[in-house]
């Protein structure tokens, strides 16, 4: 770790259609091999489908789905005197969003629907309804943290 100074977060440009930095980050996470326009069209198509299903605006529906997947606590390995403990720690807000988006994209990629846009729309729809693989992942992480609550005093 460098000792000179803390490097700040890079500013990312908001997405062109909705002007949301969160959505731009989501597009970047979905993007494969630098094909941003493909990733954008997949995300916008999925959001359109999601908005039709939920009856909310695209951005609002996306925000609800993301909120249901965001983890509040996670476990980190900490070595204390020869044994490794899984210590529960609170997740920083930026990391919460990053993890939630990553989990949604991973879950969508594992689904068996026809197109990626449909898979993403279905996963976001499930997340908005508090079900689906991404929500299950969050619950597993929370369960691990709850199970290891006894080691919380090893926090650093």
Curated annotation (Swiss-Prot):
Source species, domain of life: Bacteria
Record's keyword annotation contains Endoplasmic reticulum: no
Record-linked PROSITE patterns: RIBOSOMAL_S7 (PS00052)
Keyword Acyltransferase: no
SUPFAM superfamilies listed in its UniProt record: Ribosomal protein S7
Signal peptide: none
One of the Pfam families matching this protein, by short name: Ribosomal_S7
UniProt keyword annotations, A-Z: Ribonucleoprotein, Ribosomal protein, RNA-binding, rRNA-binding, tRNA-binding
GO molecular function: mRNA binding; rRNA binding; structural constituent of ribosome; tRNA binding
A GO biological-process term: translation
GO cellular component: cytosolic small ribosomal subunit; ribosome
Family membership noted in the UniProt record: Belongs to the universal ribosomal protein uS7 family.
Subunit structure: Part of the 30S ribosomal subunit. Contacts proteins S9 and S11. Binds EngA (AC Q9XCI8).
HAMAP family assigned: Ribosomal_uS7_B
Job of this protein: One of the primary rRNA binding proteins, it binds directly to 16S rRNA where it nucleates assembly of the head domain of the 30S subunit. Is located at the subunit interface close to the decoding center, probably blocks exit of the E-site tRNA.
Protein name as annotated: Small ribosomal subunit protein uS7
Organism: Salmonella typhimurium (strain LT2 / SGSC1412 / ATCC 700720)
């Amino acid at each position: 770790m460098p000792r000179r100074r803390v490097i700040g977060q890079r500013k990312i440009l908001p997405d062109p259609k909705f002007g949301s930095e969160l959505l731009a980050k989501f597009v970047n996470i979905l993007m494969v091999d630098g094909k941003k326009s493909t990733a954008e069209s997949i995300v916008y198509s999925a959001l359109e489908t999601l908005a039709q299903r939920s009856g909310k605006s695209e951005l609002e529906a996306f925000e609800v789905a993301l909120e249901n997947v965001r983890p509040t606590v996670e476990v980190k390995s900490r070595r204390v005197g020869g044994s490794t403990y899984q210590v529960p720690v609170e997740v920083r807000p930026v990391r919460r969003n990053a993890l939630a988006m990553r989990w949604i994209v991973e879950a969508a990629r594992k689904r068996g629907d026809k197109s990626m846009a449909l898979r993403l729309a279905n996963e976001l729809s499930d997340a908005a309804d508090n079900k689906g693989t991404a929500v299950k992942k969050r619950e597993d992480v929370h369960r691990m943290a709850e199970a290891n609550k006894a080691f919380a005093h090893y926090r650093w």
